[in-house]
Design a protein with these regions (language model features):
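A short, amphipathic edge element
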Residues: 49-54, 421
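N-terminal type II signal-anchor transmembrane helix
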Residues: 1-48
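Gram-negative outer-membrane assembly/targeting C-terminal domains
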Residues: 514-560
């Protein structure tokens, strides 16, 4: 006879074999495809969209149903193409209710490599806003009562692709790759947690995590949420954030915290931008720009307000405040940017990023900048205006005499190593790439002042008209020389001291041409005068102190 121990071993083996056979046979005995209509209806009613699944198969070991196709229809007001489509979807279920009660209880959903289409219309409404809309669900009583209680333990998207289309913008759709998303404890009636990551063109990445819900079943875009956003190495142009024509470029990192009640969103964070360029003809800044910002946005009207926002470049700090409004692809600003006593040494190498050029071989050294600029209009073509004031700075390395041409012979101007500017103030207006400068006041240490107006064209052509006046010791030296000059030359110098010398500045910012207006000095005469016509072929008598006079006038005319 068989011993008791051996009997139990034999029975266990037999039972194990039977169980194994059943486990293997169940997927064949259970036609999972029979559950496809029921699951499609459940998901369609949950989303408010038509959900279509391909052939369903069942895996007992993974406890999941696998469909070889998935399609979720879009809101017909936006597109007839699918909102979501994927080659495969895994639906985790509770095995026992499925086998014994023929009941489907969904525990998880995993969508592999889906293509998701996000569309925004001209009224700033998104195609996902109608997701979960109760008015679009099935009218069956049993479905209506069960849908609010639908919950999914885990909803995942793996290796997705999201295409973002703005119907109000002329720009092509933006495509975001490698989208990974996970929602835990998803329910239409209770809060849930989520995380998301994706890649931008140009090696940029974004990760978002937070909490959402309860789900707004009338408008999904108004579902309350919190979010922690981290963006790394976002290429502003290559990533499609700004069009190339805007002239803005750079690489940005962003960290932000968002809190939304479904009506308004409060955002607080930082931006660090490298290689930043803010003008079409600008060049990348060599150092990073750091921004601290706080903003509140109305999600319905897409209006917002900037508060407690600062922009720092080195030790230079700008305060930014104002409002904005987005309509379609256009965002309009009404903001100010101000600074008080910002060190010019920290701003000098940022000027090329703004498209501002210094004369070739020169640079600003020392001093401070004070300004309060208004920034209005569309973000891709803003109008910037307001007062600008520089104090106690030096334009080093600018050879003035070489720019003065024939006038240098008259005033005796000689090359200088720099121009010490006590004050430079003006009212600036920049629009369309061109600059208007009004009410210019320039005070050069020990030389004099210059006042006037001018413009810089989008091609950087200069057209300035100023009046230069001697003052202090320079004026005294010139006055003593007048007594030794007779005739036309003496009258010219006397007029220059009394009324100022009209000066025209043309050329370009990198190569300006500075020309005293001799015709203006003589009251219109028969034509422009030059050094030869004023002084004769032999010039001034040898006893006239031309060196002192020339240096005095030349310094004022050139160094401004």
């Amino acid at each position: 006879m068989m011993s008791g121990r051996r009997l139990w071993i034999t029975l266990a083996a037999v039972l194990g074999g039977i169980i194994l056979i059943l486990l293997i046979a169940i997927p064949f005995l259970l036609n999972a495809d029979n559950y496809r209509p029921r699951i499609q209806t459940m998901l369609s009613d949950a989303t408010g969209r038509q959900v279509t699944l391909g052939h369903l198969s069942f895996s007992l070991f993974s406890g999941s149903l696998t469909a070889d196709q998935l399609s979720i229809s879009d809101d017909p007001a936006f597109s007839q193409q699918p909102f979501v489509q994927a080659q495969q979807i895994h639906i985790g279920i509770e095995v026992k209710p499925l086998i014994f009660d023929k009941e489907v209880k969904i525990q998880s959903i995993t969508i592999d490599t889906p293509k998701i289409s996000l569309i925004q219309n001209q009224a700033n409404v998104w195609n996902y806003a109608s997701l979960g809309n109760a008015s679009k669900r099935s009218n069956k009583p049993e479905t209506q009562s069960s849908m609010p209680n639908l919950s999914i333990g885990v909803l995942e998207v793996k290796d997705g692709q999201v295409t973002i289309t703005d119907l109000g913008a002329p720009t092509p759709p933006r495509v975001i790759q490698n989208v990974q998303a996970k929602i835990s404890d998803f329910s239409l009636t209770t809060p849930f947690t989520y995380s998301l990551s994706a890649a931008f063109p140009g090696n940029g990445t974004v990760s978002v995590s937070g909490k959402g819900g309860p789900f707004n079943q009338a408008d999904a875009s108004k579902t309350p949420f919190t979010a922690k956003i981290e963006v790394k190495h976002a290429d502003l142009v290559g990533g499609g954030f700004v069009p190339p024509s805007a002239g803005v470029a750079g690489i940005a990192d962003l960290n932000a915290d968002v809190t939304s009640n479904g009506q308004t969103a409060h955002v607080q964070g930082t931006i660090d931008a490298t290689q930043l360029k803010l003008a079409v003809n600008g060049s990348p800044a060599p150092r990073p720009v750091h921004v601290n910002f706080t903003m509140d946005q109305n999600l319905a009207s897409l209006t917002g307000q900037l508060q407690n926002t600062t922009l720092a470049y080195g030790k230079a700090l700008f305060n930014i405040a104002g409002t904005y409004q987005t309509q379609g692809a256009k965002t309009t600003l009404n903001a100010t940017a101000s600074t008080q006593g910002a060190p010019i040494n920290d701003l000098e190498d940022f000027l090329p990023a703004l498209g501002i050029q210094m004369p070739s071989g020169s640079k600003l050294q020392g001093g401070t900048l004070t300004t309060n600029l208004a920034i209005t209009g569309a973000t891709d073509a803003p109008v910037i205006s307001g007062p600008v004031r520089l104090n106690n700075t030096t334009l080093a390395g600018f050879d003035l005499a070489s720019k003065m041409g024939p006038a240098a012979a008259l005033v005796g101007a000689k090359p200088g190593t720099g121009t010490v500017v006590q004050i430079l103030s003006l009212n600036l207006r920049e629009a369309g790439g061109g600059i208007q400068a009004q009410n210019i006041l320039l005070t050069v240490a020990g030389l004099g002042t210059a006042t006037g107006n001018g413009t810089v064209s989008p091609a950087k052509a200069l057209n300035f008209h100023v009046v230069a006046k001697l003052q202090g010791g320079v004026a005294s030296a010139a006055t003593s020389a007048i007594s030794m000059i007779g005739g036309t030359a003496g009258g010219l110098v006397g007029g220059a001291l009394k009324n100022g010398i009209p000066v025209t500045i043309t050329g370009t910012a990198s190569s300006p041409i500075i020309t005293p207006d001799m015709k203006g000095l003589t009251g219109g005469g028969t034509g422009p005068l030059n050094a030869g016509s004023l002084l004769g072929k032999k010039g001034l008598p040898s006893q006239i102190p031309t060196k002192g006079l020339g240096n005095s006038l030349g310094g004022l005319l050139g160094k401004h």
